[in-house]
Amino acid sequence: MRSDIGRLSKYLIERKKNLGLTWEDVSRKLGKSPVYCAMLFYGYAQADDEEVKAVAELLNLEEKELAELKDAPYREPQQPVPPTDPFVYRLYEVVILYGPALKDVAHEMFGDGIMSAIDMSVELEKVEQEGAERMVLTFNGKWLKYRKF
């Protein structure tokens, strides 16, 4: 478990681990994607009453212990820049390496704008290809055109 996350996040992640739960288990209980559930536990998403109730039931906790989950999160990066964790660094490297080409192709397809990171979903799947496990990471974000004024 990471040492640079908040008190509640540490508690929730440790509790999940001690109960032998996976992110898929949490996902089924909350009715949200595994990535969203991990974001919630890590303090990057804001829970509604229904989600707090589901987390409390899943982790055998009192809802009042989870009241902080209903607060708007302070979405400060929890990794140094550049990241030092190998997995997170590789994602950073992908953006640095492919970013300019992706931007150019996206602008040809959609026009001048950006992909929303707010109106966006992230999906992660495991596939088998040529006898090897592969990871498919999908960002599905609304295209926001720059406005002229």
Curated annotation (Swiss-Prot):
Q: List its EC numbers.
A: 4.2.1.104
Reactions accelerated catalytically: cyanate + hydrogencarbonate + 3 H(+) = NH4(+) + 2 CO2
Q: Which residues form the active site?
A: R90, E93, S116
- Its protein name is Cyanate hydratase
Q: Which GO terms describe its biological process?
A: cyanate metabolic process
Function of the protein: Catalyzes the reaction of cyanate with bicarbonate to produce ammonia and carbon dioxide.
Key word Lyase present in the record?
yes
- Source organism (scientific name): Aquifex aeolicus (strain VF5)
